[in-house]
Amino acid sequence: MILLPALTFNSVYSVIRGALWGNKKFVPYCVIDLVEELCMIAMGVFLVSGMTSVFDGAKRIAFAIVFSYLVSFTLSMIYFFVKGGKLADPRAQMKPLLASALPITGMRTSSSLINTVISLILPARLIAAGMSSAEAMSGIGVVMGMSMPVLSIPATLIGSLALVMVPELAENFYRGNHRQLKDNIEKALKLTCLVACAIIPALFALGEDLGVLLFDNEECGRIIKRCCFMLLPTSISMITTSILNSVGYEKQTCGYFFIGAAATLLCTWFLPAYIGIYAQIAGTAASAVISCALNLRLIVKKSKEKVRFLKHTLICAVSILPVCLLGALLRNLFVSVMPLFPAVILTGAILLAADALFLFALGLAEPKWAKLLVKRS
């Protein structure tokens, strides 16, 4: 009940945020979001400090959320009207809006439901495979609470890239600027591959150490090291889904999502007996590979201008292997002569620099791309 008023504030703010995004006004978009988060944290800390019970603390946190949503709603409304925004009759836009929004809404809603199903199935299948209840829950906690956040690092950069490229992609598509659209798609795909291929070797070489340093958990580190290669298909799947959604293929990406979700559920059901807790990660990777392949196929099929990305992607993927070997050698060298923390920092810095030089030498990256990525992210 406490959170119900926040639904109104957040719904209206989401519309204004969408308008800011579509009009490429990224600075107010980001500033208002940042202020909302800061208000939520500050008010939450202030209110929780006086709680008398767990239930009272939960209520106070809910009030902090409502307050932060009210702040973002107020700031966005002020900005909207100060910049000349006006209210209009939405009925003429209802049909195209629903046609575009329903598939994406279906994906988001279904994703939450599927995650709920997985959270019920996975422990049961792990226990059936021979784990105790405590071991199963501990393993799930390590994967979902420790390893996956680290493996999601590329998603931050790619999400920022998608945020600023989607309006440009949509504009070029609906104006029929197919040449510029092709260039946008190629640039997005190549930058995504470079980001993933730059991070994978670092996680492979330093994954076990990161698990110890960040969470004091060796199993977390082993999972990061063994599963870091899934970042390439997951990153490409993420950016290609954003590309297709921006040019009117929301129904297709929704269908691909359900195919990938089916693969995830199958892995979650059948694989725990063979690979234990890694079944969840295998399901995520399988879903990403399927979505990635289907998305790329649709992009190639529907593009008026031929999109060239396969050679660049394959060479990027192959380039990961020698850099991983270099990272492992550097890590072993530095760990033998200095404490773990400085060894990890030094290895990571040298490895990222060497990887960047290697990619530039192979002609896979251009200096202007690095500037573009930093500017847009």
In which residue ranges do the predicted regions lie?
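Interhelical loop/hinge segments that connect adjacent transmembrane helices in multipass membrane
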Residues: 54, 58-62, 77-109, 176-179, ...
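Helix-loop junctions and terminal segments of transmembrane helices
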Residues: 152-177
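Alpha-helical transmembrane segments of multi-pass membrane proteins
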Residues: 1-13, 205, 215-240, 255, ...
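Hydrophobic alpha-helical transmembrane segments
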Residues: 31-46, 53-82, 259-263, 277-298, ...
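Membrane-interface junctions at transmembrane-helix termini in multi-pass inner-membrane proteins
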Residues: 9-31, 229-259, 274
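Helix-terminus/linker motif at the lipid-water interface of multi-pass membrane proteins
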Residues: 109, 113-154, 171, 211-215, ...
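Membrane-proximal transmembrane or re-entrant/amphipathic helices at the cytosolic face
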Residues: 328-377
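Alpha-helical transmembrane segments of multi-pass membrane transport and lipid-handling proteins
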Residues: 46, 182-233, 265-266
